[in-house]
Amino acid sequence: MQILTTHVGTTAMSHATEIAFGRFSKYAPQIIMHLIDDNLFSVWNTTFNYCELNNHYGFFVPVELALYTVMSPNQESFVAVNETEFGIIITQLFIVIVLRAAKVCDIEVERMMVHFEILHDYAKMVCSSDAYALYESLVSFYKS
């Protein structure tokens, strides 16, 4: 199956995230950059302001094809992940934070929950075993 992506720059970022994440899209830039600051060990040499928003699964992918070194939640180990794995991890953590903060379970919250499950299943398929283990530990950490 071919997965189509849409390149979004700074001006289109809010529109693209609004399509994927509804009213929660306005929090994406701040939360995603905070997650990167907290979890990325390697130098951040690209930006999510210029990224691919995957149209099928709805996750951000850094423009630069590279390996990113991500810290485990206990900050005792590091895992190298590719740009797709990194995008999935960061997007899922964004969704977890939004769902934890949501006060009312409305249609957009339900849509985000479904989005999380779809992307979770996709992560199982495309992530390496190390990246998937890191993904699960980070999601568990941010859920608690």
Regions found by a protein language model. Give the residues of each.
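Low-complexity, glycine/alanine/valine/leucine- and proline-rich hydrophobic stretches
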Residues: 65-73
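Polybasic, proline/glycine-rich intrinsically disordered low-complexity segments
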Residues: 4-7, 72-144
